[in-house]
A protein has these predicted regions:
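Periplasmic-binding protein-like
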Residues: 127-141, 159-161, 201-207, 257-275, ...
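Beta-alpha junction/loop-to-helix N-cap segments that form part of ligand/metal-binding clefts
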Residues: 64, 79-84, 98-169, 236-244, ...
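Non-transmembrane, solvent-exposed beta-strand/loop segments in proteins
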Residues: 444-487, 491-674, 678-679, 701-708, ...
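Extracellular/periplasmic periplasmic-binding protein-like sensory domains
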Residues: 278-358, 370-375
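Solvent-exposed, acidic/polar segments of extracytosolic/periplasmic ligand-binding ectodomains
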Residues: 398-467, 474
Length: 777
């Protein structure tokens, strides 16, 4: 039985000094671990911010490269001038977003020549005095020719995608043309009118300027009469004081001519508009043809103020033919993507000027990348010369640039090579590909010319042969999409396919290039008839199609379902499939609503958009033909591609797949409130959460096919793994502090861990919300 100590009597042990563990030399352990933890957090934050800042500094520390553009932003050519500027700016913006050229951002100086010669010459001196390394523009020959000598004397590289004056490049070795010459365009137009359209008489109405109207008229007349046709020429005065008088004379002459033939307008669109209105209002309905200046939908829209046009769309322009370097309904996917981007950026449909000056900017940037530049005021002349040399070296497809519509390069005279001349026809206010095109035969030795000419498939103009290329207006109307199989990378589609064309019996001989199984027989259309001179075929097609799914953004992903076909018998020179914009009613806003109906069976996906593109399939095999052994053979077959963009419904997916992970985030965070006296329990909960999340990640990956990259959702799991690991390391550090009785340091460390945890989670959520802000539907 123990005896209680008497009051006032000290126990012997209380007199002994309390023994503490020996203190370590240096900084107290608790403070050391706390500082180490803070230092680790700072290193992570500073490393992230520093890396981002360095990358930004590297892209902005170098002086910007300066380019200039001279275009018409006011005056009669303001519309195409604005288009050209927007096309250039669109490409330069994309280059700057990607880091610029060799670390240099690109600045664009914009000069408005107002479609006025005197202003253009002043602009030329301003451009030369600026730090611009090269210039894009001018828009047309009437402005370019008078200022050409100024640019030549300054050795300033100039790239134009629209100036056609024949002599401008020969008079200036620093001028580079990405387009056709006046002679090429007018001569080809004459051949088309005579050989394809079958006209034997032509009335040439031209503006009396020496830079464009007169040489265009002369070239057309020379070729047309050389083929055996007859012409009459009628001049329209550019001088406003004389213009109405000459216009009245033109109308009077044509009104009293019973056989005016085709009326060829050798002039820019502003003058062509005046002539067309005068002719149509006086009842002259003869077919007309023009150069490329009026060749766009915007030209038809420019008549909207007239009552005749409002009551009957296309009243003035229906039946008008025009040449063009680019027709969007027969353009490849790259051009269609550009058109979509342009419309999203500027809210309007682009004409050919926008696309061609986008390509001019591509060539300019390629020259900047290859040139050796010091980019100082003292080196400006040498830098300009270096860029000119790089442009001059682009004399082959390999040395050139891959543009929107094919390779971009120059001949030795600095003229663009292989620039196509297409012909369009206005119909109900739209500029569409004409039913027959002319395609030059690049290697006549590989073609049985006599046989093909006898069959009416080719025509001869001098020493040049041309294929008569049939245009097939094609469209796909989606009826239903079902069974998107992620594992097999396929989807099932049910749709209608139609074609409208002249002549060619082989137009419907197609194969679906990405079909795994399809029910289609070209010999059994649902409907077969001839309408307005065009053969019309309608097919009902069902099948399974292969897809190339991209899961980098999973589950915030957008996928593209592609249905494409190609002709299996005729090459692309003989037949081309174009987008039937009228049949597809692409201009109507109800098109998207109709397309959404096809996806009603897909509960996990939402329809976003549909894009059509004329496509080309290339075969580089010689097929054992000895004539092809020593050639760079490339046989191309035309086709059409329909690309449907769909988007995963993110919110339902996140609710069903991430709810468990969210609970684990909360569980680990809740464990931080466990008393530091029970750090072992905290470790157990964290390890359990870590292992559970690993199992969840395996379940997510099992839903995807075998892919060799990390998807977006996986990064959330990886971040959670890192947080768990951080919590475990800190818990062990805090346990060590407890051993030394550093309670204050433990509390501070725990508070900091709370802050870091919440900060990481908040930053991750914000980042995903910002990056995928348009995907949460």
């Amino acid at each position: 039985m123990s005896q209680e100590p008497e009051p006032g009597v000290l126990h012997a042990q209380s007199l002994l000094p309390r023994v503490h563990p020996p203190a370590r030399r240096g900084r107290p352990p608790g403070r050391r671990y706390l500082l180490l933890f803070i230092l680790l957090a700072l290193v992570l934050v500073v490393g992230f911010v520093g890396t981002y800042s360095v990358s930004k500094l590297q892209s902005t520390s170098k002086a910007a490269y300066t380019l200039a553009i001279s275009t018409s932003l006011s005056g009669s050519q303001a519309a195409p001038g604005q288009e050209a500027l927007q096309g250039v700016q669109l490409y330069l913006d994309s280059v700057n977003r990607a880091g610029g050229v060799n670390g240099h951002t690109l600045d664009l100086l914009v000069f408005n020549d107002k479609d006025d010669v005197a202003t253009a010459q002043k602009v030329a001196h301003q451009v030369i005095a600026s730090p611009a390394l090269l210039m894009l523009g001018p828009l047309y020959s009437g402005i370019a020719v008078p200022s050409n000598q100024i640019y030549r004397n300054a050795h300033l590289p100039v790239i134009s995608a629209s100036v056609s004056n024949d002599a401008i490049t020969s008079n200036n070795p620093f001028f580079f043309r990405l387009g056709t010459t006046t002679t090429q365009e007018a001569s080809t137009s004459a051949t088309y009118a005579f050989q394809i359209l079958g006209f034997r008489n032509a009335s040439i109405v031209y503006t009396d300027d020496a830079t464009y109207g007169m040489p265009t008229a002369q070239s057309f007349a020379s070729t047309f009469t050389g083929d055996g046709g007859t012409v009459q020429t009628l001049a329209l005065a550019q001088n406003p004081a004389q213009r109405q008088k000459t216009l009245d004379a033109i109308v009077n002459t044509l009104a009293h001519n019973p056989k005016p033939g085709i009326i060829f307008l050798a002039m820019l669109d502003t003058y062509a508009r005046q002539v067309i209105v005068a002719l149509r209002q006086h009842g002259i309905i003869a077919p007309m043809m023009s150069t490329d200046s009026p060749g766009s939908d915007s030209f038809a829209a420019s008549f909207s103020s007239y009552p005749e046009e409002r009551s009957q769309p296309g009243y003035f322009t229906d039946g008008l033919y025009a040449s063009s370097p680019l027709l969007y309904d027969s353009a490849p996917a790259a051009v269609q993507n550009f058109s979509t981007l342009y419309q999203q950026t500027y809210g309007k449909v682009p004409g050919w000027h926008a696309a061609k000056y986008y390509e001019a900017a591509q060539v300019a940037v390629a020259a900047l990348q290859a040139a050796t530049l010091k980019n100082t005021s003292a080196s400006l002349s040498d830098d300009r010369m270096s860029i000119a040399e790089q442009l001059g070296s682009m004399t082959s497809p390999q040395a050139g640039v891959v543009g929107l519509d094919g390779p971009l390069y120059f001949d030795n005279a600095h003229n663009g090579v292989a620039i196509p001349i297409r012909f369009g026809q206005f119909s109900h206010g739209q500029f569409l590909s004409a039913p027959i095109q002319m395609v030059s035969i690049s290697n006549p030795a590989l073609v049985n010319l006599a046989s093909e000419e006898h069959a009416g498939n080719i025509i001869q103009v001098g020493k040049q042969y041309y294929w008569k290329q049939s245009v097939v207006y094609a469209g796909i109307d989606l009826k239903e999409v079902s069974n998107i199989n992620v594992t097999d990378s396929t989807f099932t589609a049910d749709f209608y396919l139609w074609m409208r064309y002249i002549g060619s019996a082989n137009a419907t001989n197609i194969s679906f290039t990405n079909a795994s199984s399809v029910m289609f027989d070209p010999s059994t259309p649902v409907t077969s008839q001839t309408i307005n001179g065009l053969q019309y075929r309608l097919y009902h097609v069902t099948g399974d199609f292969k897809a190339d799914y991209d899961y980098h953004d999973y589950p915030f992903d957008q996928q593209q379902l592609i249905i494409s076909f190609q002709n299996t018998l005729l090459t692309g020179d003989q037949l081309v499939y174009v987008i039937d914009t009228q049949g597809l009613q692409l201009e109507q806003h109800t098109t998207m609503d109709d397309a959404k109906v096809a996806f009603q069976l897909l509960s996990s996906w939402t329809y976003r958009s549909t894009q059509y593109a004329s496509d080309t399939f290339t075969n580089r095999s010689t097929l054992g033909n000895p004539l092809l052994f020593n050639t760079q053979v490339r046989t191309e077959y035309s086709g059409l591609e329909m690309t449907i963009t769909i988007q995963r419904k993110v919110i339902p997916y996140l609710i069903s797949h991430l709810l468990a992970l969210v609970l684990l985030f909360l569980l680990v965070y809740a464990s931080l409130f466990i008393s530091t006296k029970h750090l072992g329990d905290r470790l157990v909960l964290t390890v359990t959460a870590l292992l559970t999340s690993a199992v969840l990640l395996l379940a997510v990956n099992s839903e995807l096919p075998a892919i060799g990259y990390v998807v977006s959702l996986s990064y959330i799991y990886y971040i959670f793994f890192a947080i768990c690991l951080l919590c475990m390391i800190v818990a062990l550090m805090m346990e060590k502090m407890e051993e030394y009785g550093k309670d204050t340091a433990v509390r501070r460390t725990n508070i900091i861990l709370h802050i870091i945890y919440l900060t990481i989670v908040t930053v991750v959520v914000i980042c995903y919300m910002v990056i995928y802000s348009n995907r949460f539907i």
